[in-house]
Amino acid sequence: MKLFVYHTPEATPTDQLPDCAVVIDVLRATTTIATALHAGAEAVQTFADLDELFQFSETWQQTPFLRAGERGGQQVEGCELGNSPRSCTPEMVAGKRLFLTTTNGTRALKRVEQAPTVITAAQVNRQSVVKFLQTEQPDTVWFVGSGWQGDYSLEDTVCAGAIAKSLWNGDSDQLGNDEVIGAISLYQQWQQDLFGLFKLASHGQRLLRLDNEIDIRYCAQSDTLAVLPIQTEPGVLKAYRH
């Protein structure tokens, strides 16, 4: 299993895809996806474009649905939900399809949607991701951070490191790029205080300015949800069933 870390979707190679792509947007899209599916949502369907989400939802008739939209850290007008994972309670989302668009995470999913296997990771479901990769043993794994509008993000990188640390056997042949070691090192330095790191991160600072420390604390928890979101068709994620 060869591991690669890419800090943003723009940093990924354009002429190839991995056997398995792991998309990460800890603050907050992939945390919200994991939380929604763990709470019983039928699926999460992602849209990079807000207009596309509204147009699609107007014709959708197969299952009950909720629209979840976020831009700049705030809920989009006309959507029932924003991008707060804490809104995804069983009472709210069970049996429903979540139509989701966010500033960064949905763009990262779009970049790798043609890979044979696409899963999403966050701190909350880290161990489920590790177990899946240890079992499936894909030849190449890309950890794709969502970043913030094309820029590096601490929280996505440290999550990639948290997963890669459990997969790396110490053999240099497993390292696809230097970013893997950087991510693992960041996790080793901050693993006892991820909440503190997230508050220092630029997107954590944005959420703090929006008076949303509680979401940061939620997203900084590790291994609290036994759920693995996996793409079943382009843009559609469901809970993986063994």
Swiss-Prot record:
The keyword Endoplasmic reticulum does not apply. Signal peptide: none annotated. It catalyses: (2R)-O-phospho-3-sulfolactate + H2O = (2R)-3-sulfolactate + phosphate. Pfam families: 2-ph_phosp. GO terms for molecular function: 2-phosphosulfolactate phosphatase activity; magnesium ion binding; sulfopyruvate decarboxylase activity. HAMAP family: ComB. This is Probable 2-phosphosulfolactate phosphatase. It comes from Picosynechococcus sp. (strain ATCC 27264 / PCC 7002 / PR-6) (Agmenellum quadruplicatum). The gene is comB.
